[in-house]
From Swiss-Prot:
Belongs to the tenascin family. Residues 1044-1061 have a biased composition (Basic and acidic residues). One of its GO terms (cellular component) is cell surface. GO terms for molecular function: identical protein binding; integrin binding. This is Tenascin-N. Residues 1323-1540 form the Fibrinogen C-terminal domain.
C-alpha cells in the first residue's frame, strides 16, 4: 500500500474534523445578557483541495460551507456586523513521491495549529467585556464549590451545592417533597423514609418475612402478600388456581400440587381403521382449549405430524396414512397453551385393498382370475374358491406379481358351476380386506352333432348329451340368406327335427346347452335340403318356329334351370336357363310340328325332378306380300309361298268404306289379280294359308287405285300480278287440288285448292311474265295426272316520276324501272302553250335530260313502257325552268371583323339580291341587298375565320343560282399569357386562345444567357409545358398564332424554374419505433434537406438534414403506425417539391396470451392488446390431430371465445395482429379442452338386488370412467372402469331402494362433467326390515353390514352386522372379539353408545340393544359363539332383553341350550357395570378388577368383554362353564334374532356381501 493509502484515513478524519469543528460559532450568546448589539459570533472555515491522485474519501459536510457563510448563522441571526467569519483556502500540490505527501500533511497540520492559536487569541479578545455588569465577579470564587463559565457568565456548581455562587448545600432529590433539607440531609415526613424521603414505609415491616425495598416488601421465598404475612403455594398455583393457606385449589382442567399440569385425556381408542386412515376417539372434556393430536409410524418418530383439534370434537380421522402400517397416536389436552401428559395408542392401518378383480377367461373346467395389486407391498395372496352352493372351499397361495396385476388360473372345475372366489392380501401376520367375486365355468357343449333324414323342407339333427346340469338345449339353424330360427329342445333329448326349411338350401345348424342365462359353446353341422322341381309348366305365345315355356320357380337356391324339347321325329335339344328366370322362348322350331318339353332345376351336380308338357307350332304365313300393276280399277298381288304343307291360300281385299271381297288361290300359286276396283280408293289386302281348320297368321298390305286427273284447264282475268285458272272436276273422292305455276326463269309455287272448287286466282305474279300452270288432284300421298296451260301477265307502268337538276333551259326527269321485261320507254314533255316534244329511251335507263326548254316555263312530262305492241299505263309530273344568277363575285377591304363583297348584276328582272355569309362552324347570316346595288359590307365577323359568301337573285319565291366565294378575316393575337405549374425542369405556359381559326401556335422561350428554342403546338391548345429547362433559370416566353403563312402579333412573359426535388425516396430497415429513409440527392445547389414525418393521427415531426447527406433515421415512432414521410430541398426561402413515401412501423405482437374458462368445446383466450392501430386480430387454433381454424377478432377486443373445439383435445393457439396485408409476430399458447361426459347413462335388467348400467362413450379420448353410486345410509362407492367398458353391473343392493348413480370420464387428472341417473331395485318383502331375519327374507343371503329400521320405522335406521350363516342366519351380531386390537376397557358412555368396527371387533351399544329388544312384540333369543383355534361351542337362551338406562340396562335372559355351558343365567337380572359406573353387588368394582364392562353380579361367570389374551384369573375373555376363569377365549361373537326363526321357512337366492360389483 502506498503512502497515500496509509494517510487516507487520518487525512480524511482530519478534514472532516476541521469542517465540523472549526465552523462552530466562537462565542454563543450569554443567557445573562439581553443586548443583541453586544453579541459577536466568530467562525472560520477551511477549504482544502486534495489532489485527485490521493485516495482520501471525505464525506460532504452536512452544513454547506459556501463562501457567503450563511450556513454558519443560527436561524434568526440577522446582524451581519456581529458575525465574523474567517475562511482559509488550502491547496495540496500533487506529490512527486510518498515523502512529499508526508511533508505536505505535516505542513497542513502546522498551519492549522497556528490558525487555531490565532483563533484562541481572537476569542480571548472578543470575550473581554462580554458579560453583563456585576457578573464578572463570579469568575473569581464560585464559593470554592464550582467552576466559572465565561461563555455563560455563570457558575457550574459541584455535586451537593447550589446557588448562584455555589454556596448552598443540597439534599438528595430535594427530599422529593416528603421532608425538609437540614444541612444537606433530609428529615422525612411520616410515613416516608429513605435518604431522599422517596418511599413510604413497608406495611407491617414485611411481617419479619421479607425486606423492604423502596417501600415494597421483597418477601422471602415461602411467603407472599403485601406484607409477607401469607405462606406461598407451590409455584403460586401457576396462575391456574388459588392459594389457600399454602395449598393450591386448581381451576377445572388443571391438576397437580402447583396446578401446573393439565388433566390428561381419557379413553383414547381406535374406532375404525382403513388402508390410509385411523379414526380415533376419546372422552370429551369441556375444560380444555383444544386437543393436540400427533402420530407417526412406529420406529419413525422423526416423521411425527401434529394436528390441533377443536375442543368440541372428540373424534378425529387421521388420513393420508400408509396401508398396513403401525402408528403411535398421542393425544394431549391443551389449556392456556399448556399441554397435558400424553395418552398413547398403537393402531395399525388396514392392508391396502386389492384393486378391482375380475375373471379374465371362463372355460368349462377353469377360471382365469386377475386382480390389480394394491399400492402397498404385500407378501402374497390367499385365494379361496368353492362352489357357491356347496361347503367345499379350496385355498391356494399366490405370489404377488411384479406387474401391476396378479393372476391365477383355477383349473379342475366342474362345468356349468358358479364359484365364489376370495382374494386376500397377506403381509406378515396381517390379512387385508378380502375382495369377493364370482365366476362361473362354462357349460360343456354338445358333441358329435349330425344331420340325417333330409327332405326338401325337413332335416333330423342329433348329438351326444352334455355333462353339465342344464335347463335345455337350443338348436339354431341359419339359411344362406341369413334367416335364422331357433328351437328349444328338452334337456333329456339329444335329437330333433328341423321343419319349415327351404328346398335346396345348405343350412348351418348350431346346437348348445343353456342354464339360466349361461350358454355352452356351440357345436355346429350342416343340413342340405333336396331341390324342389318346377311346377305349373305351360306353353304360350306359340308361333310357327318358336314357343314360350313358363313355370313356377323352385324355392331352392339353384344354379340354373334346364329346358329340353323333342319333336315327333325324335330330334332333341337342351337349353340352360338362368336361375332368376321363370320362362324361356324355344326358337328354331319347325312350323306345324308338335314338341314334348321337359324342365328341371340344377345346383352343382344335383337335379330336381322333371316337369313336362306338349306344344304344337303354328303354320307359317305368306311373306313378302306386294302389289303392283295398279290402275284406276285393278291391281296385282303376289307373295312368297309358305313352308308348311297346306290346302290353299285365301286373299281378301277391303275398301276404305268397308266393302270386302274374298278370293281362294290354289296352294301352288303365289299371285293373283284383283279386278272391279274403284278409282282413288285404298284397299287393304290380306293373304293367309289354310290347312283344315288351322290357319296361318295373315300377311297384309295396302294398295290404293289411281285417281283420274282434271280436264279443260283455262286462264282468264289477267292483270300485272294476277290471273284466274279454272278446270273440270275429277270423279274420284280426293282430298284437294294442287295448282303449280312456274315462271320462265324456273321460279315455282304451289297452291292447294279445296276439293269442292274447280277454279282459283293466282296472285303475287310478276308483270309481263308468261307462266306455265299445272293442275292435279291429290288424295293422301297419291297424285292424279296433271293438266297444264300457259298465261302471260300485263306490263307495269313506271313509278315515282320526279323532276330534278332544273336549269334555265334544261330539266332532268327520273323514275323507278318497271318489273316487266320491256323493249323501251317513251318520254313526252309539253309546255303550257302546247308545244310538245316526244322521244324514246332505252329499257335499261331510268332517267333522261329534257333540253331546249325556255327559262321560267312550266312543262308537263309523261313516261310509259312498251313491249312490242303492248304498252303500260302513263306516269306524269311537272318541270318549271330556273332564272339566271349573279357573276364575278369578289371580296376586299378585309379586317379582323369586316369585309366588302361585290358582283355583276343579273340580266333578269328580280325583286332583290340576297347575301349569305357562313363561318366554318355553320353560323350563318343573310343580308338582303336592293336589286339596284351590286355590293355590300359584312360586319360583326370573327377574326381569323374564313367565311363562305353566297349571293343570289330572288323574284317572288324563286331563287337564282348562287354565286359564292371565300373570304378570311385577319388572325387575332394570344392574350393573358401566363406561366404556372413551375417545376425544376419545366414551365407550364397558358394563354387565352385566339378567336381566329388557325393552324397552330408558335412558342419561343429564351434563357437569360440568350439560349433560345422555338416549337409549334396545335391550334386547339391554349397551354404548353416547356421541358428540358435548367432548374432556377429565368426564361422569356413568346407565343403567337399562325394560319398558313399568316401570323398574329406576339404575346410574351417571363418565368423561372423550380429547384429539383429529391427522388427515389424509399423506406428500409423498419422496426417498431424506427425507420431509415434514403433518396437520390438533388442536382441543384441547396442549403439543406428537410424531412417531415406524420403519423396517421396527424402527429408531425420535422427535422433538417445536411445537404451532403441523402439518408436519415426516423426515431421515436409508434408501433404499427403508418407514417407519411416527405423530403424536400431548401435554398433560402425557396423549396423544392416534396418527395413522399410511406413508412409503416412493424406491428407489435400480442403479449401475455393466456387461456381460461375452458369447457368441452370452447376456450376463452385473452391477451394484452397491442399498441399499434390495427384492423383486427387473427386467432388460429390447431388441434393435436392437425385440424386448423382461423377466426378474426375485432381490434377493440383482447379476448375471444374459441368454439367448435373437440372435447379432450389439446390445441395450439396463435394470436397475431393484422393491418391490411401486414402481420405482427405470433404469440402462442396451448389449451386443453375439457372431456365431454358419457352419454345416455341408463339402467336395465333391474332385479331385487341389482341391475346393469349402460352408456355411450364420449367423443374425447379418455383413460377410463369413475362410476359412483350411493347407498341409503349415505355411503358412497366409487369404481374406476377402463375406457373400453360401456356397461357395469351393480350387485348386492337393497331391495326397493333407489340408488343415485353418477358417471364421469377421466384422462389423467382431467374429469368430465358428471352424468347422473338412478337405479331403483325391485321392492322387497320388507321395505324397512326391523332385524336381520327380515333382511334375510328379502333374499339377502350373505353375511355383512345391512341397514335395519327399529320397529320397521323408516326414520330410525341402524346399521348392523347380520350373520346369515350360523344356524340358518338372521342374527344381529352385537359383540365380537377376534383380534384383541380393540380395547374393551371403556367408560359407561362408550358402552351405552357402542364402539368399534362392526366388520371387526366391536360392541353394538346398550341403547341399541334396549331399543331392539324392548317395546316390540318380537321376542328375541340370544346366542354366544365361542371358538379357540381348534374348538368351538355355543350357548343359546330363548329370551333376551335389555332394560332402559333408568334401570341401568338390566339383563333378562331365558332358558339355556347349547354346548358351551350356562354362564348367563348367573347374570340374569343384573345391571350393567363399567369402571366408572359401579352397579354390581361386589365389594369392589367388578369392571375395574376384571378389565371390562358387563352385567356383573358378584363379578362373573361370563366375561366376554374382558382383557383380550389375559390368562389371569377372571380378567380375560372368559366363559367359565366352558374354559374356566383362566383361559382367554380368542373368538367370541354374541348375536340375537327373533325366537323360533328358521330360514328353512323362507326361500330366496343367495347374495354376496354388500357393495361388491362385478364388471363385464
Amino acid at each position: 500500500m502506498g503512502l497515500w493509502g496509509m494517510l487516507a484515513f487520518p487525512l480524511g478524519f482530519l478534514l472532516a474534523s476541521v469542517l465540523l469543528v472549526a465552523s462552530a460559532p466562537a462565542t454563543p450568546e450569554s443567557p445573562g445578557c439581553s443586548n443583541k448589539e453586544q453579541q459577536v459570533t466568530v467562525s472560520h472555515t477551511y477549504k482544502i483541495d486534495v489532489p485527485k491522485s490521493a485516495l482520501v474519501q471525505v464525506e460532504t459536510d452536512p452544513q454547506s460551507l459556501s463562501d457567503d457563510g450563511t450556513s454558519l448563522l443560527a436561524p434568526g441571526e440577522d446582524g451581519e456586523e456581529q458575525n465574523i467569519i474567517f475562511r482559509h483556502n488550502i491547496r495540496l500540490q500533487t506529490p512527486q513521491k510518498n515523502c512529499d505527501l508526508a511533508d505536505s500533511v505535516q505542513d497542513l497540520l502546522a498551519r492549522m495549529k497556528k490558525l487555531e492559536e490565532e483563533m484562541a487569541e481572537l476569542k480571548e479578545q472578543c470575550n473581554t467585556n462580554r458579560c453583563c455588569q456585576g457578573a464578572a465577579d463570579l469568575s473569581r470564587h464560585c464559593s470554592g464549590h464550582g467552576t466559572f463559565l465565561p461563555e455563560t457568565c455563570s457558575c457550574h456548581c459541584d455535586q451537593g451545592w447550589e446557588g448562584a455562587d455555589c454556596d448552598q448545600p443540597t439534599c438528595p432529590g430535594a427530599c422529593n417533597g416528603h421532608g425538609r433539607c437540614v444541612d444537606g440531609q433530609c428529615v422525612c415526613d411520616a410515613p416516608y423514609v429513605g435518604v431522599d424521603c422517596a418511599y413510604a414505609a413497608c406495611p407491617q415491616d414485611c411481617s419479619g418475612h421479607g425486606v423492604c425495598v423502596q417501600g415494597v416488601c421483597q418477601c422471602h421465598e415461602d411467603f407472599t402478600a403485601e406484607d409477607c404475612s401469607e405462606q406461598r403455594c407451590p409455584g403460586d398455583c401457576s396462575g391456574n388456581g388459588f392459594c389457600d393457606t399454602g395449598e393450591c385449589y386448581c381451576e377445572m382442567g388443571f391438576t397437580g400440587p402447583d396446578c401446573s399440569q393439565v388433566v390428561a385425556p381419557q379413553g383414547l381408542q381406535l374406532l375404525k381403521s382403513t388402508e390410509n386412515s385411523l379414526l380415533v376417539s376419546w372422552e370429551p372434556s369441556s375444560e380444555v382449549d383444544y386437543y393436540l393430536l400427533s402420530y407417526y409410524p412406529l420406529g419413525k418418530e422423526q416423521a411425527t405430524k401434529q394436528v390441533r383439534v377443536p375442543k368440541e370434537q372428540h373424534t378425529y380421522d387421521i388420513t393420508g396414512l400408509l396401508p398396513g402400517t403401525k402408528y403411535i397416536v398421542t393425544l394431549r389436552n391443551v389449556k392456556k397453551d399448556i399441554s397435558s401428559s400424553p395418552q398413547h395408542l398403537l393402531a395399525t392401518t388396514d392392508l391396502a385393498v386389492v384393486g378391482t378383480a375380475w375373471v379374465n377367461e371362463e372355460t368349462e373346467t377353469s377360471l382365469d382370475v386377475e386382480w390389480e395389486n394394491p399400492l402397498t407391498e404385500v407378501d402374497y395372496y390367499k385365494l379361496r374358491y368353492g362352489p357357491l352352493t356347496g361347503q367345499e372351499v379350496t385355498e391356494v397361495t399366490v405370489p404377488k406379481s411384479r406387474d401391476p396385476k396378479s393372476r391365477y388360473d383355477i383349473t379342475g372345475l366342474q362345468p356349468g358351476t358358479e364359484y365364489k372366489i376370495t382374494v386376500v392380501p397377506i403381509r406378515g401376520d396381517l390379512e387385508g380386506k378380502p375382495i369377493l367375486l364370482n365366476g362361473r365355468t362354462e357349460i360343456d357343449g354338445p358333441t358329435n352333432v349330425v344331420t340325417n333324414q333330409v327332405t326338401e323342407d325337413t332335416a333330423s339333427v342329433s348329438w351326444d348329451p352334455v355333462r353339465a346340469d342344464i335347463d335345455k338345449y337350443v338348436v339354431r339353424y341359419i339359411a344362406p340368406d341369413g334367416e335364422t330360427k331357433e328351437k328349444a329342445v328338452p334337456k333329456d333329448q339329444s335329437s330333433t327335427v328341423l321343419t319349415g326349411l327351404k328346398p335346396g338350401e345348405a343350412y348351418k345348424v348350431f346346437v348348445w346347452a343353456e342354464r339360466g342365462n349361461q350358454g355352452s359353446k356351440k357345436a355346429d353341422t350342416k343340413a342340405l335340403t333336396e331341390i324342389d322341381s318346377p311346377e305349373n309348366l305351360v306353353t304360350d305365345r306359340v308361333t310357327e318356329n318358336s314357343l314360350s315355356v313358363s313355370w313356377d320357380p323352385v324355392e331352392a337356391d339353384i344354379d340354373r334351370y334346364v329346358v329340353s324339347y323333342t319333336s315327333v321325329d325324335g330330334e332333341t335339344k337342351q337349353v340352360p336357363v338362368k336361375k332368376d328366370q321363370r320362362s324361356t322362348v324355344l326358337t328354331g322350331l319347325s312350323p306345324g310340328v308338335e314338341y314334348k318339353v321337359y324342365v328341371w332345376a340344377e345346383k352343382g351336380d344335383r337335379e330336381s325332378k322333371k316337369a313336362n308338357t306338349k306344344a304344337p307350332t303354328d303354320i307359317d304365313s305368306p311373306k313378302n306380300l306386294v302389289t303392283d300393276q295398279v290402275t284406276e280399277n285393278t291391281l296385282s298381288v303376289s307373295w312368297d309361298p309358305v313352308q308348311a304343307n297346306i290346302d290353299r291360300y285365301m286373299v281378301s281385299y277391303t275398301s276404305a268404306d268397308g266393302e270386302t271381297r274374298e278370293v281362294p288361290v290354289p296352294k301352288e300359286k303365289s299371285s293373283t289379280v284383283l279386278t272391279g276396283l274403284r278409282p282413288g280408293v285404298e284397299y287393304k289386302v290380306h293373304v293367309w294359308a289354310q290347312k283344315g281348320t288351322q290357319e296361318s297368321r295373315k300377311a297384309n298390305t295396302k294398295a290404293p287405285t289411281d285417281i283420274d286427273g282434271p280436264k279443260n284447264l283455262v286462264t282468264d282475268q289477267v292483270t300485272e300480278t294476277t290471273l284466274s285458272v279454272s278446270w273440270d272436276p275429277v270423279e274420284a273422292d280426293i282430298d284437294r287440288y294442287m295448282v303449280r305455276y312456274t315462271s320462265p326463269d324456273g321460279e315455282t309455287k304451289e297452291v292447294p285448292v279445296s276439293k269442292d272448287k274447280s277454279s282459283t286466282v293466282l296472285r303475287g305474279l310478276r308483270p309481263g311474265v308468261e307462266y306455265k300452270v299445272d293442275v292435279w288432284a291429290q288424295k293422301g300421298a297419291q297424285d292424279s295426272r296433271k293438266a297444264n296451260t300457259k298465261a302471260p301477265t300485263d306490263i307495269d307502268s313506271p313509278k315515282n316520276l320526279v323532276t330534278e337538276q332544273v336549269t334555265e333551259s334544261t330539266a332532268t326527269v327520273s323514275w323507278d324501272p318497271v318489273e316487266a321485261d320491256i323493249d323501251r320507254y317513251v318520254v313526252r314533255y309539253t309546255s303550257v302553250d302546247g308545244e310538245t316534244r316526244e322521244f324514246l329511251v332505252g329499257k335499261d335507263q331510268t332517267s333522261t335530260v329534257l333540253t331546249g326548254m325556255r327559262p321560267g316555263v312550266e312543262y308537263q312530262v309523261d313516261v310509259w313502257a312498251q313491249k312490242g305492241t303492248q304498252e303500260s299505263r302513263k306516269t306524269s309530273t311537272k318541270a318549271p325552268t330556273d332564272i339566271d344568277g349573279p357573276k364575278n363575285l369578289v371580296t376586299d377591304q378585309v379586317t379582323e371583323t369586316t369585309l366588302s363583297v361585290s358582283w355583276d348584276p343579273v340580266e333578269a328582272d328580280i325583286d332583290r339580291y340576297m347575301v349569305r355569309y357562313t363561318s366554318p362552324d355553320g353560323e350563318t347570316k343573310e343580308v338582303p341587298v336592293s336589286k339596284d346595288k351590286s355590293s355590300t359590307v359584312l360586319r360583326g365577323l370573327r377574326p381569323g375565320v374564313e367565311y363562305k359568301v353566297d349571293v343570289w337573285a330572288q323574284k317572288g319565291a324563286q331563287d337564282s343560282r348562287k354565286a359564292n366565294t371565300k373570304a378570311p378575316t385577319d388572325i387575332d393575337s394570344p392574350k393573358n399569357l401566363a406561366i404556372d405549374q413551375v417545376t425544376e425542369t419545366t414551365l407550364s405556359v397558358s394563354w387565352d386562345p385566339v378567336q381566329a381559326d388557325i393552324d397552330r401556335y408558335v412558342v419561343r422561350y429564351t434563357s437569360a444567357d440568350g439560349e433560345s428554342k422555338e416549337f409549334l403546338i396545335g391550334k386547339e391548345q391554349r397551354s404548353t409545358v416547356l421541358t428540358g429547362l435548367r432548374p432556377g433559370v429565368e426564361y422569356k416566353v413568346e407565343v403567337w398564332a399562325q394560319k398558313g403563312a399568316r401570323e398574329s402579333k406576339k404575346a410574351n412573359t417571363e418565368g423561372h424554374t423550380d429547384i429539383d426535388s429529391p427522388k427515389n425516396l424509399v423506406t428500409n430497415q423498419v422496426t417498431e419505433n424506427t425507420a431509415t429513409i434514403s433518396w437520390d440527392p438533388v442536382q441543384a445547389d441547396i442549403d439543406r434537406y428537410m424531412v417531415r414525418y406524420t403519423s396517421a393521427d396527424g402527429e408531425t415531426r420535422e427535422i433538417p438534414v445536411r445537404k451532403e447527406k441523402s439518408s436519415t433515421v426516423l426515431t421515436g415512432l409508434r408501433p404499427g403506425v403508418e407514417y407519411t414521410v416527405q423530403v424536400w430541398a431548401q435554398k433560402g426561402a425557396r423549396e423544392s417539391k416534396k418527395a413522399k413515401t410511406k413508412a409503416p412501423t412493424e406491428i407489435d405482437s400480442p403479449k401475455n396470451l393466456v387461456t381460461n374458462r375452458v369447457t368441452e368445446n370452447t376456450a376463452t383466450i385473452s391477451w394484452d392488446p397491442v399498441r399499434a392501430n390495427i384492423d383486427r386480430y387473427m386467432v388460429r387454433y390447431t388441434s393435436a390431430d392437425g385440424e386448423t381454424k382461423e377466426i378474426p377478432v375485432s381490434k377493440d377486443q383482447s379476448s375471444t371465445i374459441l368454439t367448435g373445439l373437440k372435447p379432450g383435445m389439446e390445441y395450439t393457439i396463435h394470436v397475431w395482429a393484422q393491418k391490411g396485408a401486414r402481420e405482427s409476430k405470433k404469440a402462442d399458447t396451448k389449451a386443453l379442452t375439457e372431456i365431454d361426459p358419457p352419454r345416455n347413462l341408463r339402467p336395465f335388467g333391474v332385479t331385487h338386488s341389482g341391475g346393469v348400467l349402460t352408456w355411450l362413450p364420449p367423443s374425447a379420448q379418455i383413460d377410463g370412467y369413475i362410476l359412483t353410486y350411493q347407498f341409503p345410509n349415505g355411503t358412497v362407492k366409487e369404481v374406476e372402469l377402463p375406457r373400453g367398458q360401456q356397461r357395469f353391473e351393480l350387485q348386492d343392493l337393497e331391495q326397493g331402494v333407489t340408488y343415485p348413480v353418477s358417471l364421469v370420464a377421466f384422462k389423467g387428472n382431467q374429469r368430465s362433467r358428471t352424468v347422473s341417473t338412478t337405479l331403483s331395485t325391485v321392492d322387497a318383502r320388507f321395505p324397512h326390515p326391523s332385524d336381520c331375519s327380515q333382511v334375510q327374507q328379502n333374499t339377502n343371503a350373505a353375511s355383512g353390514l345391512y341397514t335395519i329400521y327399529l320397529n320397521g320405522d323408516a326414520s330410525r335406521p341402524m346399521q348392523v352386522y347380520c350373520d346369515m350363516d350360523t344356524d340358518g342366519g338372521g342374527w344381529i351380531v352385537f359383540q365380537r372379539r377376534n383380534t384383541g386390537q380393540l380395547d374393551f376397557f371403556k367408560r359407561w358412555r362408550s358402552y351405552v353408545e357402542g364402539f368399534g368396527d362392526p366388520m371387526k371387533e366391536f360392541w353394538l351399544g346398550l341403547d341399541k340393544l334396549h331399543n331392539l329388544t324392548t317395546g316390540t312384540t318380537t321376542r328375541y333369543e340370544v346366542r354366544a359363539d365361542l371358538q379357540t383355534f381348534n374348538e368351538s361351542a355355543y350357548a343359546v337362551y330363548d329370551f333376551f332383553q335389555v332394560a332402559s338406562s333408568k334401570e341401568r340396562y338390566k339383563l333378562s335372559v331365558g332358558k339355556y341350550r347349547g354346548t358351551a355351558g350356562d354362564a348367563l343365567t348367573y347374570h340374569n337380572g343384573w345391571k350393567f357395570t363399567t369402571f366408572d359406573r359401579d352397579n354390581d353387588i361386589a365389594l369392589s368394582n367388578c369392571a375395574l378388577t376384571h378389565h371390562g364392562g358387563w352385567w356383573y353380579k358378584n363379578c362373573h361367570l361370563a366375561n366376554p368383554n374382558g382383557k383380550y389374551g389375559e390368562t389371569k384369573h377372571s380378567e380375560g375373555v372368559n366363559w367359565e362353564p366352558w374354559k374356566g376363569h383362566e383361559f382367554s377365549i380368542p373368538y367370541v361373537e354374541l348375536k340375537i334374532r327373533p325366537f323360533g326363526y328358521s330360514r328353512d321357512r323362507f326361500s330366496g337366492r343367495k347374495k354376496r356381501s354388500i357393495g361388491k360389483a362385478r364388471m363385464f
